Structure formats: C-alpha cells, structure tokens
Amino acid sequence: MKKTLLACLVFLSLNVLASKPKHQFVRISTDRGSCVVLLYNQTPQHRDNFVKITQEGKLSGTLFHRVIKGFMIQGGDPDSKTAKPGQALGDGDWGYTVPAEFRDSLFHKKGVIAAARDDNPLKASSACQFYLAQGKVFTDEQLDLLEQNRLKRKIPTWQREVYKTLGGIPHLDQNYTVFGEVVQGIELIDTVAAVKTGAADRPVEDVRMTVTVLKKKEAKKLEKKLRLATQP
C-alpha cells in the first residue's frame, strides 16, 4: 500500500514538473497598448530578478520616463510612481545591482528588453530600470564604419542581417545586458517612442505601465504558439 502511494505521489510530481512552462513571460500594459516579453533562460539572474520585482509589484505604476525615438524607451524607476510633472527621473533604484550577463548570441535587435545601468566598471545592471530597443535599420556601409570607429570588433554576419532588416542598436552590444525580447505587441515600442517629450526626454504626458507575469496556462499556450517548448 505504501509503495503504491509513493508511486502515485512520484507520478503526480513528475506530471506537475512536466506541465510547467520552460520559459517566463511578462506582459507590459499601458494606456497606449501592451506587449508580451519572453525572458531569456540564457540570462537567469536577470530573468529571475525581473520576475521577482514584477511579482512584488515594484514595476507596476512606474513610467516610461525616458523616450528617444529611433533609440529606445526606458522605464522602471521607482521614483516615477509618484513623480510630479517635469520632475527629473532616472536615478531611482532598489539598492542593489544584477551582475552583467553578456552572451554573444544576445544582441540589441529591435524589440529586445535590456537592463539600464549607471557607469560602473563591471557593467552591472540596475535592479529595476530597463529599456525596450527600437533603434534603426542600418546599411552595410554604416555597420562597417561602426565596426571600425566605435566597436573595434566585427559584428557576426547573421547579426548584421538582422540590423539591416529589423534594425536595432548595435553599439550597445556587450555593454548592456539583453535579457529578453518582445514576442507579441512590438508595435507598442513604436507607439511610445513617437510621443512628445520634454526635458530629459521625459514624455510630456505620462506613459504609466502595469507589469504582470503570465500565468502557467497562458505561458504554455504561448510557448506552443511560438514553438518554444523544446528550446532551452
């Protein structure tokens, strides 16, 4: 009897584990639209931290406080929750950083989410401030000049093709940790990037966000749709 019960418990436990999605997703919602972001398993410290602060409600209610068309939209500053109109933002944090997790395969194509940071030698990331990359489309000539004058390295051929079609921000590669990408609603980036801004690139009209972690059922459904279930 005990062996049968133990076997049943093991079977149920395996089923529960098997039913868990292999990836974490978050939804960023604003009054101008929403998007869903896949958090990369290749950057586990950033993934886990972003899930943690999202579940704790630390991101919901913050603003996209820095918006530069053709570059990126930045948010997550805790000070922005109660910021007055025109107040300078960008220095708020939660008192800790996340170690850099640079990966050669993860780069600043349009639609990625990456961690903002201050000017520190280890390039450690802010625990809360992040940006969604918009960037621009490049030509081969522009990428060649960027390699020679700024990067001092070669951009992999397959990444060049992405920068020439989808676009992005290649000069930020290996300087700011990329830890996910928008898989639904990428048009939100263009919408927010187009808003009127004032001093310090802050939108004249607040763009406030609500950030939530997708529940297991929805995450598994999205994995299947994106054919991610068998990927790391």
Where are the model-predicted features located?
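Sec-dependent N-terminal signal peptides
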Residues: 4-12
